[in-house]
Amino acid sequence: GLHGEAYRGHIFWDELFIFPVLNLRLPTVTRALLRYRYRRLIEARRAAKLAGYAGAMFPWQSGSDGREESPDLHLNPRSGRWNPDPSHRAHHIGIAVAYNVWQFYQATGDLAYLIDYGTELLVEIARFWVSRASYDEERQRYCINGVIGPDEFHSGYPDRPYDGVDNNAYTNVMAVWVILRAIDALTLMPLPNRLDIREKLGLTDAELAQWDRVSRQMFVPFHDGVISQFEGYDKLAELDWERYLQRYGDIQRLDRILEAENDDV
């Protein structure tokens, strides 16, 4: 963006916070900007397939052609060390794309957009999340493991610090939300259009039945009756905030401070 070159002009999920304003004041602009994602749907499908999933996996950092532009390494200027950058595991970017599609429709009632572009995006993102979820026999619930949620500081566990966390609450709940909105979009379409897109995408009754199972049996972690941010969140040690504030003053990048101390968030 205009603030600097740190992100090299890439597109993240920040449009999630901008589109609600545009939807009500300049909806034609939102519609045009949403085409950016649709035009990169082929690349998102390719990325999902390479990762072993179905549907479309949008990149955390997107550029001109829709490939994943997130770096593999990240420099910590406090320690001088280059560490793995696992931000490509922030798969919730696809949730943001789906949310923007649905919010645009809700604000404008533009059914033509859903028919031409939006439903296809929703279906392919829903497919990704259904394939991303794995069934836990013991819990009798579906789990989504190895992701990074909106809290990018927590990117793993002590024994696998860069492999993502399991069952991030935001990700799991919103994955179900995407599945339900994809079904809603299909239902809203006139029957001929619905049959056309189902044929185009090969969307079968059996696949929709699996969507229903995943949406009804998604695991959400709780601790003492409170939703946990992710599985194991309740086991995190509390930071000595006063000591770190006194020592460093600005602790906005606490992840860098702790890494320089050979520690981790």
Question: What does each model-identified segment do?
Answer:
Residues 1-20, 24-265:
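Acidic, mature catalytic/reactive cores of soluble proteins
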